[in-house]
């Protein structure tokens, strides 16, 4: 919200997010620990309603924890992506293991027939490795559109696959 120039308040967050938890845990674990019912249908319906009400040609539906992260005890983030049938913007950051994690996510998305609109590789802080290196390694094995977001350079600093 803040990045979009919106005021962050409990009301503004609840208008776009069905559940929000303090602990940085997979959604199913966070819901279980908070005593919140894990209702995949409610999550899917809420998200579809948000998309409809926005009336926009684009909608960012942010997942938590990655493509294969459990959303509920019986559904993964990738299940929601497939049910919504939206193009995927995959976000990665350069760290040890990122090549493997990113290629695995790409393969999982491809196996489900999900369109990867772009892979955004961000640099979370100035000390992080250059995102271009991760882009080069990913592109060595899989051809996907890639955009780079260097630290402090704005949303999209360059396009590694152009």
Feature roles, as predicted:
Residues 25, 139-160:
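Beta-strand-loop-alpha "switch" segments that mediate conformational coupling across diverse proteins
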Residues 42, 49, 63-143, 147:
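Conserved catalytic-core segment of NTP-binding enzymes
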Residues 33-48:
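Glycine-rich phosphate- or other oxyanion-binding loops that anchor nucleotides, phosphorylated ligands
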Residues 30-33, 132-136, 157-162:
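Short, surface-exposed amphipathic charged segments that create phosphate/polyanion-binding patches used
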Residues 54-59:
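Loop/turn-to-beta-strand initiation segments
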Residues 14-19, 120-123, 144-154:
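Beta-strand->loop->alpha-helix junctions that form or flank phosphate-binding loops
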Residues 1-37:
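N-terminal phosphate/diphosphate-binding loop that engages ATP/GTP or pyrophosphate donors
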